[in-house]
């Protein structure tokens, strides 16, 4: 499948998700190539139906600029109590609809939006599907003051940590001024155990394991089909 065909599938999946958004609701919007198609589909609804939303919050400046360019007003997370629906992408999704997110470095804001949402839908293509969470480094955001100790601790646990670097080869700094340590992309058969370990590690701000959060995944398959998979 070439990129044009893949983009067409992503667009179809994103359009399906856009149809699920209720008018005058509070919407959370993630980021990524598939989410960009979702935002375009919202813009088409706005133009065609006069579609509007009560509030929109987003997890990236890129999505914010795209939404504002289509005439939507984007609010801060602090401006809302709870999103009715959040639509986002994911770096990996397993059979239980648990996922790894944060490849773009915005995992803390992504999780904040997610936990303040009544419903979460992820849009992905089939390349993101795995049986057990693996095949993509797990990002862990850490405080600079404890980063070295965290790195050594992760090494001792056999988690094969790597510093995330920017384009200049220096440590990547998040929106909140923290570092990211990427853990090994090895299979994670017990993700809840790893999440619990990270949740109780001093200096860890947030991690990219999104467990028991996603309600529905819309999957674009290479055979041209769109699958709608819901949490059991």
Swiss-Prot record:
UniProt-listed Enzyme Commission number(s): 5.3.1.6
Pathway: Carbohydrate degradation; pentose phosphate pathway; D-ribose 5-phosphate from D-ribulose 5-phosphate (non-oxidative stage): step 1/1
A family per Pfam: Rib_5-P_isom_A
Transmembrane segments: none
GO biological process per UniProt: D-ribose metabolic process; pentose-phosphate shunt, non-oxidative branch
Catalytic activity: aldehydo-D-ribose 5-phosphate = D-ribulose 5-phosphate
CDD domains: RPI_A (cd01398)
Positions contributing to substrate binding: 31-34, 88-91, 101-104, 128
Gene Ontology MF: a single term: ribose-5-phosphate isomerase activity
Active site (record annotation): 110
GO cellular component terms attached to this protein's record: cytosol
Keyword Isomerase: yes
Keywords, in A-Z order: Isomerase
Signal peptide: none
Function: Catalyzes the reversible conversion of ribose-5-phosphate to ribulose 5-phosphate.
Subunit structure comment from the entry: Homodimer.
Family that this chain belongs to: Belongs to the ribose 5-phosphate isomerase family.
Name assigned to this protein: Ribose-5-phosphate isomerase A
